Amino acid sequence: MNGKVIVITGALGALGRVVAETAQQRGARVAGVDHAPSPMAVATPERIEFGGVDLSDAKQAKHAIDAAAAHFGRLDALVNIAGGFTFETVADGDITSWQRMYALNVLTALNASKAAIPHLIASSAGRIVNIGAMGALQAGAGMGPYAASKAGVHRLTEALAAEHKGKITVNAVLPSTIDTSANRASMPKADFSKWVTPLELADVILFLVSDAASAVTGALIPVAGRV
């Protein structure tokens, strides 16, 4: 990670914070992008944050990505963590949930990737890592909108990998349930010890960003924890 410049979307969320902190600990310089307001008052040579960014809007995504590249002088990797979740059946749900999941999960990754690609091609080792979902491999009851949108992320990953082979590696990690406070609150009777931790996911994500993963592209990698 030493010296690599990484943009992380969803950087203020439970997973994004851990990935950003771990990347910095390993020597990377990090630009965080999030829909939430950033608590960071002043940028540093190692870290900058862009809060209040709607990545489902292509213009806002491009502005944030270009600003990050300008701050550091280059961009080596994009980690698309921004996204959302909903649980509702097709019969009881509403079309707006499907539209919202598509915007939060597919459009955010699409817009950030499209904005980052010119910068990543200029890097000697451009990387994109997306967050898919094991739940998108086979949707269960109530998982339709979320699973369909994450399946879209899987196909986006494969398309980008094919389009930029030899220039940028593009991969996705597919977690099971992530061990976060929000998930614990919504599933209090679950066995949390079986879930994948944010740090475990960060390790896989940052491997895919690293030089050691130069031969890996177009991969959808399940990170199941102990489920």
Explain the meaning of each model-derived region:
Residues 118, 161-163, 214:
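Alpha-helical segment proximal to the catalytic Tyr-Lys
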Residues 166, 172-173, 180, 190-227:
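C-terminal helical subdomain
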Residues 89-90, 97-99, 128:
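Substrate-binding pocket helix/loop in short-chain dehydrogenase/reductase
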Residues 12:
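Conserved glycine-rich cofactor-binding loop
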Residues 113, 149:
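Active-site helix of classical SDR
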Residues 133:
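Residue(s) in the substrate-gating loop at a strand-loop-helix junction
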Residues 93, 139-147, 159, 183:
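Active-site loop-to-helix junction immediately N-terminal to the catalytic Tyr of the SDR YXXXK motif
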